[in-house]
């Protein structure tokens, strides 16, 4: 609720909020609003294991394989899809049942997330990264 209140001040800007913690799915609905892209490493607050999603989400921005439309820029949607696929593959490779289900919400079936780019120098996405004490990405503003 605190983050939702903080972000309510941004009424004309697009906001990307990435929560890669375990049980981060609980953030999804309170944070969702028009003009926001919310990415969580888990689908629900009940998925409480350590998450692999952040490693792959960050790696996506440095891997040409994540640039699915081959436009030279990796959107938040492309990074999300890349990371989700990598998590699934990692679980399968280890023979584990998939217990981590990343979620993306942007009130438009991924359309806004497909047009927001991070770390590319494009002026349509000047965002900052919030890193927690353990070096994990906890928010992109």
Where are these predicted regions, by residue range?
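Acidic, glycine-anchored loop motifs typical of Ca2+
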Residues: 1, 67-76, 94-125, 129-130, ...
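Extended acidic, low-complexity intrinsically disordered regions
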Residues: 140-141
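Catalytic-core segments of thiol-dependent peptidases
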Residues: 1-22
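Active-site-proximal C-terminal subdomain of hydrolase catalytic domains
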Residues: 15-107
């Amino acid at each position: 609720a605190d983050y939702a209140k903080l972000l309510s001040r941004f009424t004309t800007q697009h906001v990307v909020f990435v929560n890669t913690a375990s049980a981060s799915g609980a953030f999804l609905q309170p944070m969702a609003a028009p003009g926001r892209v919310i990415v969580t490493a888990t689908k629900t607050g009940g998925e409480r294991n350590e998450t692999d999603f952040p490693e792959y989400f960050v790696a996506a921005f440095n891997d040409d394989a994540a640039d699915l439309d081959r436009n030279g820029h990796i959107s938040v949607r492309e990074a999300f899809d890349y990371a989700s696929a990598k998590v699934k593959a990692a679980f399968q490779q280890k023979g584990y049942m998939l217990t981590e289900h990343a979620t993306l919400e942007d009130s438009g079936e991924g359309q806004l997330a497909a047009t927001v780019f991070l770390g590319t120098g494009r002026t349509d996405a000047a965002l900052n990264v919030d890193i927690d004490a353990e070096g994990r990405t906890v928010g992109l503003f």
